Amino acid sequence: MASIKTLSTGKPVDLSIRGELSEIADSVNQASQVLSRQNQARANWISGVSHDIRTPLSMIMGYAQRIAGDHEANGNIRQEAEIIRAQSAKIKDLVQDLNLVSQLEYEMQPLHKEPVRLSKLLRSYAADLLNAGIGEKHSIGVDVSSEAETAVIECDARLISRAIGNLVQNSINHNPQGCDIFLSLDCSSEDVSITVADNGVGMSAEKLRELEEKPHYMESTDERLDLRHGLGLLLVRQIVEAHDGIMKIESTPQSGYKTILTFRWPRSLK
């Protein structure tokens, strides 16, 4: 029954059953093989499209950047070229997210796990963001509990940083009026939790429920912004689940937004 349930989620299985149920097992295995080939074909197609888009997109970004930096060009033209460059960069990020979501969903993205000290990872991310320039309307802070200061887990540091970055960018995008962003780390004897929170516009219980059900379709709580949470939040969930973790979202209108990423079995760095 567990294997059939797994198959229903879109993941292939392999049943080894003899006797009267062997024919059923064979049928399930055949269906699993077909599903596996379909998943492989879908992931390969997305990867191919992503690769084909990157080259012309890089050319567009390069030409736009050159025009935007040409001081002899008309001011309006330079401004429009900068808009093209910025929007092209967003498309490039979306293509990368789409490819990574696909690879994680079909378990085709290799995880390069190693012992990672999470307090160091959080502080390094915050420092890099501040050095790159977060903007005057937003601020970022890091809070690490004394218990979590030396907490270490086996993870892919690049992907965990990507998840944190997507959550921070989500707070920035959906709070153009400005907000404070907080990164915190805490742990217990059973798990370690990374929390990304802000004190921005938040969302209603209904919108929160919709977001949890369809994270890649959810619209912004502020209709004037015409923003969507996009693939970013879906990618965070895929990364967390690939590490056998849990993602939980908490929010209320005008009281901020919080995402908690929980991973089991932390270890202290000796």
Spans of features found by a protein language model:
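Acidic ATP/Mg2+-coordinating residue in the GHKL
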Residues: D198
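Short conserved segments within the C-terminal catalytic ATPase subdomain
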Residues: A132-V144
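Short alpha-helical segment of the dimerization/phosphotransfer core of two-component systems
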Residues: A86-I91
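Short conserved segment of the HATPase_c
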Residues: M203-E219
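Short helix-loop "hinge" at the ATP-lid/N-box region of the Bergerat-fold HATPase_c
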Residues: S171-I172
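Membrane-proximal HAMP signal-relay module
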Residues: M1-S47, Y63-A68, G75, G230, ...
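Conserved micro-motifs of the catalytic ATP-binding
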Residues: Y106-L111, T150-C155
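A conserved beta-strand-to-alpha-helix junction within the catalytic ATP-binding
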Residues: H112-A127
